[in-house]
Amino acid sequence: MDLPGPIHEILVLFGGFVLLLGGLGVVLLTNPIYSAFSLGLVLVCISLFYFLLNSYFVAVAQLLIYVGAINVLIIFAVMFVNGSEWSKDKNYWTIGDGFTLLLCITIPFSLMTTIPDTSWYGILWTTRSNQIVEQGLINNVQQIGIHLATDFYLPFELISLILLVSLIGAITMARQ
């Protein structure tokens, strides 16, 4: 979006603050329905960041796929779980929880140090020069594919990882 500097900064700070609160709600709330709604809030805030970064296609895909489908599916699945199962477990911290916390702290820091130093266009198969030459020769669907493979490669891969984690979580819940 082409917003003035202060408004853009306020929206980024607001989105980040709401994103942090929603993430804490997903992890800390004991009621799984409230956690699922917090996850929906997190996904909407991520979509807001994509709008602010002028990647409207990824933002709309985030809203439609993750907020509209995945989060509704999670809420639907959680509503079938017996509510008494969640209130009986009073063992709050285990060794696995500590390992998971350590992993959840180290992965974002390693990503924050790795991603800015990586030249993403050197990794990708298509380059900017090929994209400019082919723009007049291809249709809109192929242009979307080229944009997903060049400009929006990292957000597209991160969204696919989020989908993978949600599918693993759904399978784990279904087995229990």
UniProtKB/Swiss-Prot annotation:
<feature type="transmembrane region" description="Helical">
    <location>
        <begin position="60"/>
        <end position="80"/>
    </location>
</feature>
<comment type="subunit">
    <text>NDH is composed of at least 16 different subunits, 5 of which are encoded in the nucleus.</text>
</comment>
<keyword id="KW-1278">Translocase</keyword>
<keyword id="KW-0813">Transport</keyword>
<keyword id="KW-0934">Plastid</keyword>
<keyword id="KW-0874">Quinone</keyword>
<feature type="transmembrane region" description="Helical">
    <location>
        <begin position="152"/>
        <end position="172"/>
    </location>
</feature>
<dbReference type="InterPro" id="IPR050290">
    <property type="entry name" value="NAD(P)H-Q_Oxidoreduct_6"/>
</dbReference>
<keyword id="KW-0793">Thylakoid</keyword>
<dbReference type="GO" id="GO:0009535">
    <property type="term" value="C:chloroplast thylakoid membrane"/>
</dbReference>
<dbReference type="InterPro" id="IPR042106">
    <property type="entry name" value="Nuo/plastoQ_OxRdtase_6_NuoJ"/>
</dbReference>
<dbReference type="GO" id="GO:0008137">
    <property type="term" value="F:NADH dehydrogenase (ubiquinone) activity"/>
</dbReference>
<feature type="transmembrane region" description="Helical">
    <location>
        <begin position="95"/>
        <end position="115"/>
    </location>
</feature>
<comment type="similarity">
    <text>Belongs to the complex I subunit 6 family.</text>
</comment>
<keyword id="KW-0472">Membrane</keyword>
<feature type="transmembrane region" description="Helical">
    <location>
        <begin position="10"/>
        <end position="30"/>
    </location>
</feature>
<dbReference type="Pfam" id="PF00499">
    <property type="entry name" value="Oxidored_q3"/>
</dbReference>
<keyword id="KW-0812">Transmembrane</keyword>
<feature type="transmembrane region" description="Helical">
    <location>
        <begin position="33"/>
        <end position="53"/>
    </location>
</feature>
<keyword id="KW-0520">NAD</keyword>
<keyword id="KW-0521">NADP</keyword>
<comment type="function">
    <text>NDH shuttles electrons from NAD(P)H:plastoquinone, via FMN and iron-sulfur (Fe-S) centers, to quinones in the photosynthetic chain and possibly in a chloroplast respiratory chain. The immediate electron acceptor for the enzyme in this species is believed to be plastoquinone. Couples the redox reaction to proton translocation, and thus conserves the redox energy in a proton gradient.</text>
</comment>
<keyword id="KW-0150">Chloroplast</keyword>
<protein>
    <recommendedName>
        <fullName>NAD(P)H-quinone oxidoreductase subunit 6, chloroplastic</fullName>
        <ecNumber>7.1.1.-</ecNumber>
    </recommendedName>
</protein>
<keyword id="KW-0618">Plastoquinone</keyword>
<dbReference type="InterPro" id="IPR001457">
    <property type="entry name" value="NADH_UbQ/plastoQ_OxRdtase_su6"/>
</dbReference>
<keyword id="KW-1133">Transmembrane helix</keyword>
<dbReference type="GO" id="GO:0048038">
    <property type="term" value="F:quinone binding"/>
</dbReference>
